[in-house]
Amino acid sequence: MSRFCSSAAVALLRGLVSPAALCLGRSMSLYGAPAACAVGPAAGSGGGGGASFSARLSPPWLRLPEVLGAEPHRANELLLLLPPPVPRGVTLAQHHVVYFPGDVQNYHDVMSCHPENFQWEHWSFENIATILARRFPGSFIWVVKCSRMHLHKFSCYDNFVTSNMFGAPEHSADFGAFRHLHALLANAFRLAQNILLSQKSTRDASKEAKIAACKSQQQAVPATNGCSSTERDCECSSNSAVSFPVPAAMGAVSFTLIGFSKGCVVLNQLIYELKEAKKDKNTGAFLKNIKAIYWLDGGHSGGSNTWVTYPEVLKELAETGIEVHAHVTPYQVFDTMRSWIGREHDKFVQILEGLGVEINDQLHFGDNVPSLENHFRVHEVF
């Protein structure tokens, strides 16, 4: 059992509640690293996982629950890791990385308290966001949580693609995944803007009050340059302001889309919808701002359609000029029980290359025995 949960509490509760209920105490706050897992007596002991975990991360985080998409019944939760602060007055071109997780992945406090998934807690939403922030420095990192998790293990992206009980997709050309993603991000941008600007106003008001109080002090120690130490401190306080970047307008930024394992079903559905998305004013403009798409060891429990293999569909992707990256491991493409995955991956690459796409296709850990650990480790090597 994870070090983040009391073994006694888990033993007591395991027979009484479902695994999901073990972590229902997680925070729903919009700002700050997610709170500790509230499980039994350990919840108030000060030894929860959230406090120690947040100390290992660089804030700030924004956790946005139930962000609406294109339709009222479609909503997803998002976790945003902001890029580092920039000096006041500095404006940088914004890039946003949008990540779709795979099975078992969740917030750290949820995974660390799960009787099975705790062993993969290193690949939690927060840790993945941190890895991606290093991989794409200066970018906004968005983690899109699936709308349903069957048996607390199988990620189901029902808002993006028709899915069975375990999240295996049934792709079509008109489900509305592009419309949902565009609206979801637009609404998430606005929510993040409102939160950050509100907090910035509060900080600015507090800073101005401190400067006013500083300058009103009557006593000061003379300095060698003729300025008092109080004046120097006040000047330093007024000039040292930095602020975290706020998401800009959707049309003024660029995007990278990343799917891992089951999360690749979202990318595939987007590809199936490309032809129609190009015709729509909003999704067409959004599409032009997508610079790259990464498939990271895609796979799901269905018997086919792990990779897009229809030439007429992939032709639409080739015409966009979007960078295509495919990173796989033996866990998926060498699986003898799911041999179609490897065949479909090869066909995906072959068709795109035939269409003139310079696809970045890489096999990682090819000399190793297929393992779930290396499947997750693709995040560290792609």
Locate predicted features.
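N-terminal cap/lid segment of alpha/beta-hydrolase-fold proteins
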Residues: 2-96, 140, 169
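Short coil/turn segments at secondary-structure boundaries
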Residues: 110-115, 154-158, 269-273, 305-310, ...
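Short, surface-exposed "cap/lid" segments of acyl-processing enzymes
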Residues: 58-163
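Conserved beta-strand elements of beta-rich interaction domains across eukaryotes
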Residues: 102-105, 147-149, 262, 299-301, ...
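Short acidic, low-complexity segments enriched in Ser/Thr/Gly/Pro
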Residues: 146-239
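Well-ordered, non-membrane alpha-helical segments in soluble/globular domains
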Residues: 117-129, 167, 171-188, 233-239, ...
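C-terminal catalytic histidine-bearing segment of alpha/beta-hydrolase fold enzymes
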Residues: 4-22, 27, 34, 325-382
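Serine-dependent carboxylesterase/thioesterase catalytic core
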Residues: 196-322, 333-334
